[in-house]
Amino acid sequence: MSYVKEAFDKVKLRDPDQPEFHQAVWEVLETLEPVFQKHQKYQDARILERLTEPERVISFRVPWVDDKGVVQVNRGMRVEFNSAIGPYKGGLRFHPSVNLGIIKFLGFEQILKNALTTRPIGGGKGGSDFDPKGKSDFGSNEILSVFHE
């Protein structure tokens, strides 16, 4: 079995409920296979395992008050993938479908996008299952303030 396939199988085994993350990882790893076949030192350093496992995953509750004065609670998360070339950088995604697999997929791709800029920044992403559509600025700002802390 190739190193790339072995590393991908570990990702699927470790995170079986994250198909979006699996797809993003496979698309990247598949294109890198010739590099890993040619350079054993990258395999020895376990580069793919280090690339596909976040340095940190933070999950937290996000309480906020809606326009009717009712407290609502959403889930927030932040995935910080790689700070090898600099501090984490990545945006926020707010949508009812957001889950850890989606945030990991977006954070994983952010590593590569940031590396291409040649700026010294790593990759990360944050988000919440909060749906900003139809919400007042007050409710949306409450959610955003949690991510700025």
Locations of the language-model features?
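N-terminal ligand-binding/catalytic initiation module
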Residues: 1-149
